Design a protein with these regions (language model features):
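Carbohydrate-binding surface patches
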Residues: 152, 162-203, 207
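Active-site proximal loops enriched in glycine and acidic residues that flank catalytic Cys/His/Asp
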Residues: 25, 48-51, 107-111, 186-188, ...
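Active-site neighborhood of glycoside hydrolase catalytic domains
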Residues: 1-59
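Composition- and surface-driven signal marking solvent-exposed, interaction-prone regions
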Residues: 33-36, 61, 121, 162, ...
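Generic recognition of flexible, low-complexity loop/linker segments
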Residues: 33-37, 93-97, 170-174, 185
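Sec-exported extracytoplasmic/periplasmic mature domains
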Residues: 10, 100, 149-152
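Aromatic/acidic polysaccharide-binding cleft in carbohydrate-active enzymes
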Residues: 48-146, 161-166
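Loop/turn elements at helix/coil->beta-strand transitions in domains of secreted/extracellular proteins
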Residues: 16-19, 41-46, 101-106, 156, ...
Length: 209
């Protein structure tokens, strides 16, 4: 992808019309690629513009449309509650990684879907942070409070600051907001709670993640 961008940006007339680059999450983590783009084009925006769970709300089946148009259900052993939790963890992991490598904006493909995971232009159904019931009311999936927490820590105009994490179970991203407050997001990937010591400006904060 970087090679394609480089080729496009080599055209001066085309490059002057580019404000930034959009990217998705579907083929795995590409955090290093974001950092390379940030280094190459520091004046351009990096915006995550599409991601969503690949199953209907409250359903542990992944939905996919085959080439012949027949809908396939790919069953798994996860319960809806388990897969909702894994969705939320995937969102947090992706956002933390993107923030740490130069992302400046994040957009979900489906902020709201109906109970069938639609409407969609192709077969199947997708999940979302919010689901609209038949009477028009909204209910939150587990993804929503994760997004709330991250958006509350990284407010518009925030500047990412350096951090270091000891160990592999806890992911972190930190920033300074325009009002001078420090925002910190921690994601515990372990199966159990862990104690976290946060050192900042010579002070120590003990928390549980």
């Amino acid at each position: 992808a970087i090679e394609h961008i480089d080729a496009f940006m080599a055209d001066a007339a085309a490059a002057e019309k580019v404000d930034g680059f959009a990217f998705h999450w579907y083929s795995g983590d590409h955090f290093e690629a974001l950092e390379l783009l940030r280094g190459r084009y520091p004046d351009k925006l990096l915006v995550h513009t599409e991601s969503c769970p690949l199953h209907m709300p409250g359903n542990a089946l992944s939905m996919s449309a085959a080439e012949d148009g027949v809908l396939n259900s790919i069953s798994g052993e996860q319960t809806p509650a388990m897969i909702d939790h894994s969705d939320a963890m995937a969102y947090a992991h992706d956002m933390i990684g993107d923030l740490n490598h130069g992302m400046q904006g994040w957009i979900d493909w489906n902020m709201i879907v109906d109970r069938n995971g639609g409407p969609r232009h192709v077969m199947g159904g997708f999940g979302a942070p919010l689901v609209c019931a038949e009477d028009g009311t909204l209910f939150e999936t587990l993804i929503y409070p994760y997004l709330q927490l991250i958006a509350g820590a990284f407010r518009p105009g925030a500047v990412r600051i350096g951090k270091s994490v000891y160990g592999r179970d806890v992911e972190a991203a930190a920033c300074i907001n325009t009002d001078g407050t420090c925002g910190l997001v921690l994601l515990n990937q372990a199966a159990e709670t862990v104690s976290v010591n946060i050192r900042i400006a010579g002070r120590l904060i003990q928390e549980v993640a």
